[in-house]
Design a protein with these regions (language model features):
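N-terminal beta1-alpha1 cap of cysteine-dependent amidohydrolase-like domains
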Residues: 1-87, 95-103, 107-127, 131-137, ...
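Active-site-proximal beta-strand elements of phosphoester/diester hydrolases
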Residues: 175-179
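Conserved SAM-binding loop
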Residues: 90
């Protein structure tokens, strides 16, 4: 059975673990990541802007130890051509790992009164488009976004204001979304479990 490494506390990331189990895989928090076949980078605070050559003007919840861990994990999994799925911060980590930059503060996309915003996205031909159609509605609770793309990365979904909501690597098995597919689907919004099911099914091959 596919083992999916999730860096972090199992209690904090229980929604991710639930989605992985529902997709027929095993979430791993304390195992050796080298023994896992897939990496799932979850949401969280902002990455240090020093990683992409900027000074801090609007970052929140910086955690240099986590930054270093995720860069090491990405090096491990990409070197072995193992699948990587990123959500929210996970997508930003992937972009920075490949040399990209971030918008440090993006108005209009963060949560309101602890509730996710909902907005539409438009998808390029891809797995996401096959799952959700050319247009769908996703949740949104981020205040940073992709600015310059890292090497080998390309956009798959965009918000109406042009914000990149999903990306993939052209040659490596990497897929990331800026929204939160692990959260229970809200009425009228895309069912994120479909993404976990499809990506982890491909990762098992």
């Amino acid at each position: 059975m596919l083992r999916v490494y999730i860096p972090g506390d199992a209690a904090v990331y229980r929604n991710y673990a639930r989605a992985v189990r529902r997709a027929g895989a095993v979430p791993c928090f304390t195992d050796d990541p080298a023994d896992c076949g897939c990496l799932l980078l979850p949401g969280g605070g902002d990455l240090s802007p020093m990683l992409y050559g900027q000074t801090d003007i609007a970052c929140r919840g910086l955690d240099p130890a986590r930054d270093a861990l995720e860069m090491d994990l990405l090096n491990l999994f990409t070197s072995a051509h193992r699948p990587v799925l990123g959500a929210y911060r996970g997508m930003q980590s992937v972009n920075v790992f490949f040399g990209g930059t971030l918008v440090q503060d993006l108005p209009g996309h963060s949560s309101v009164h602890d509730s996710d915003r909902l907005h539409s996205v438009t998808a390029a031909p891809s797995l996401l488009r096959r799952l959700y159609g050319e247009r769908c509605v996703v949740n949104s609770s981020h205040h940073q976004s992709i600015d310059r793309f890292g090497a080998g990365l390309e956009a798959l979904q965009w918000a109406p204001d042009g914000t990149v909501e999903a990306l993939r690597h052209r040659t490596l098995p990497i897929l990331c979304v800026q929204w939160h597919p692990e959260r229970l689907s809200l009425p009228g919004a895309a069912d994120g479990q479909l993404l976990y099911d499809a990506f982890l099914s491909m990762a098992k091959l």
